[in-house]
Amino acid sequence: TADALSCSLVGSEMGIRVRGKAIFLLAPLVRQRKGHYRELFESMRRKGYLYVRLDGNILEIVPNMKTDRYKNHNIEAVVDKLVVKEEDEERIRKSVATAMKQGDGMVMVLEKGAKEAKTYSKRLMDPVTGIAYQDPAPNMFSFNSPEGACPHCKGLGKVNQIDIKKVIPDDKLSIHEGGIAPLGKYKNQMIFWQIESLLSKYDLNLKTPICKIPGDAMQEILYGSLENVKIEKEKVHTSTDYFCAYDGIIDYLQKVMEDDESAAGKKWADQFISTIECPECHGLRLKKESLSFKIWDKNISEVASLDIDELRDWLEEVEQHLPSMKAKVAHEIIKELRSRVTFLLDVGLNYLSLNRQSASLSGGESQRIRLATQIGSQLVNVLYILDEPSIGLHQRDNERLLNSLKELRDLGNTVIVVEHDEDMMRAADWIVDIGPKAGRKGGEVVFQGTPQEMLKTDTITAQYLNGKMAIEVPALRREGNGKHITIHGATGNNLKGVDVDFPLGKLIVVTGVSGSGKSTLINETLQPILSQHFYRSLKKPMPYESIEGIENIDKVVNVDQSPIGRTPRSNPATYTGVFSDIRSLFVGLPEAKIRGYKPGRFSFNVKGGRCEECKGNGYKTIEMNFLPDVYVPCEVCHGKRYNRETLEVRYKGKSIADILDMTINQAVDFFENVPQILQKIKALQNVGLGYIRLGQSSTTLSGGESQRVKLATELSKRDTGKTLYILDEPTTGLHFEDIRILMDVLQKLVDRGNTVIIIEHNLDVIKLADWLIDMGPEGGRGGGQLLFAGTPEEMVKQQKGYTYKFLAPLLKKSGKPE
């Protein structure tokens, strides 16, 4: 693109670039257009121009001069011819001004003997195509602004389109059997009659497998018919056959997506939609014009796609190579950019790119980005509160995070960190320990003081820090069952075509620095492959070549930290299914039988037994408009959820509301003689949740608590010993003691013959693994390789990657050979 410059700037640059050289100053008049141009040459001659550059050749202008009218031509007027000297500055400036006036804001500088001329312009214009660009403004480089956003995808970089593979997931089925997913199995409905009529033209019917229906017929079924289709009069109960238009399955789905005001309708249509890269901007989110502006051969999207450490190197390169005039303008901007990049590097985020979507960031990554922002602001006398900033951070980067927090403190601020990380506790100036246990047995300050003082106390936290309590390394690693699942050629995100073997019947821990490819391998490749196989999941796995050994397991379960329910009505009792058993128990009581109560009577979700004032919620919601909603206990049932008649039915003196208010520990004692109920609530107790209430709202449970409720549900089921469990950083939010309990539960699952795969940074989990898979060596583009696979002891011996350095001292402390 031509430089947008003023006459003086063009003159100054010429003085530097072509000093001492003979040049022609040209005014462009015609660019790649046909015509004889006799009038143009005559006009130039009358204005006093003696020479013209015609199609690259300097010619004298003569009377009646003309060109071949059927060929494309380039014509420039020769405004001046001179050898550039310092004393000619005023002459150059005037000639440039004249050339720009004649050339519509453009001037060309041609060195004597050269074939190509350099073009300058007052406007931003491509000298070859003649395309002009508006002057750049900040909004032009923002995909959140109409000035910059790609008009096709509105700046999202992606567009939704109907996926035929989701509409027809199995073409071996017939339409009658439900081969077209949006329609389901055959029903006596108009759309099936229409399709039947279309197929009859090809001597086919609804029971023909879709794979045997010719392409033309499928095209009509999916995208509509140009002709009206005939419906037999018997089907529509009319005196004559009925003819109607048929728009096709795809058109119907499009209308639901675009026009349906019902959220349920859109949600239904979403399952047949795939998100693809925008074909206009190719995922870059900006207009073509915005992407035409480049600095050091990179447009803004290319710069935004760089990892943070690559961005640092690019900034240094730009500053070194910018011309002096531009370098002066850019110096302060680059200085500020480098400062912000350094802060991001200091908190261990070197593997992130600037265009990484915030929704894909972990909680720890989001906190560390905000932390980097605060360090950069250089504020003082501020109280900072951080909740587990070490989430998702490898031990290698812990020290950098600690240094960043200390830097905030040293500026004159106070930093309060809610954290379970041992390094963070030992580095603290002051520790406040809350306990002594969880739930109703917690809520007290059991210690406050320095870490050194804490080591002398006997709180649970102190005992783990001073070594009196510990999560022990197992004496032997499991051999497994000899079977495997193997992925070949995984290339999703930063994976470098890795082949990974997962031995079954073992506790497998996947390690590696942040951004090394752990989640891509497990959550984005392995799990979707297995979910598609077992549950016909619509989520597509990341690219891979092949997988072996799926037949060696019978199901896959992802035990994550997402809530067990989205509304306050869901609770541990409903999630585990024990509430159905409790209701059945109440239905069998003599009082309930006399009154004719059914199980629905003891449900707070349906009419009959619930309090109708609060609809079984136990509280009323007061909307506060611009403030968070306020919840107050129901004035009728006083939070018990049920009406008076339902609460009159009691088991061992307790109503259904009393039982929901019991802790798990209390419920275990209460139902000790009811095996069916005891089995499920005992599982909750075994995962360390004895302190929560049976009817505690799911919205009040932490991520770790929700995860353990899910684990308890799995434990209470009868399994075949062929299940694969996947957990992503299950220790998030967990104390040492919670981790011990969690790992005991997971070990029990493996002891039954199942396989557990954990993505984890916590060394107390890593040291318990039967098998380690270490990804790396770095994050982002520097990662994606399989560094190691084997036992923890073998990892320490081979000394590959970073994880072994932190694992070795723990194995040594436990007496395990290194």
What is each model feature region?
Residues A2-G11, G15-I16:
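Single conserved hydrophobic/aromatic residue that forms the stacking wall/gate
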Residues S12-E13, R17-E818:
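Conserved phosphate-binding elements of NTP-dependent enzyme cores
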